[in-house]
Amino acid sequence: TVQYLLKRTLPQGGLAPGDFVLWHAAAGGVGLIACQWARALGLRLIATAGGPEKCRLALAHGAEHAIDYRAENFVARVREFTGGAGVKVVYDSVGKDTFEGSLDCLAPLGLMASFGNSSGPVPPVAPALLASKGSLHLTRATLFTHIATRAATQAMADELFAVVASGWVRISID
């Protein structure tokens, strides 16, 4: 999941070292891999998590900043961390509860990458909303599109195993 999001689900012009991204639910299994891989790519990952312990976990795995969404306004904190500029991409597995706020975290021309709906599905979106918030882009990424061919699946797996073998990403199984 992290491979196809960080390497294939990208804003206009891609991502470069120093770019800010926001990752919701960053203290889960996928999120902790994302924190590490983003750091390896030189990205400045802002994590959201539920509670101080989960925020510390995201920071320990490479997030530059962590926001306790239960106690803090994540939109205000993202704007603070980015000097008001916003992030290039929001990676969101939460869905309904974070969708509108996530759009407000994006820089103009930013990408909202929805890949889950743990809080429920996002309601229908009027395209004019994306225009009014800065000509934003929206995608609903799914693994099956990215592994449609054996060659694509192998290339993605090779990249994952390489980043794990390099030591940049450590996968914990509890």
Residue positions per predicted region:
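Mid-domain Rossmann-like dinucleotide-binding core that forms the NAD(H)/NADP(H) cofactor-binding site
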Residues: 1-72
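N-terminal Rossmann-like NAD(P) cofactor-binding module of classical short-chain dehydrogenase/reductase
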Residues: 22, 67, 88-91, 113
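Alpha4-beta5-alpha5 "output face"
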Residues: 59, 79, 130-131
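Short amphipathic alpha-helix with an adjacent loop that forms part of the alpha/beta core around
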Residues: 73-84
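Short, well-ordered alpha-helical microsegments
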Residues: 31, 55, 75, 99-100, ...
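Terminal peptide-recognition signature
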Residues: 2, 38, 58, 90, ...
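Glycine-rich phosphate-binding loop and adjacent beta-alpha segment
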Residues: 41, 97-169
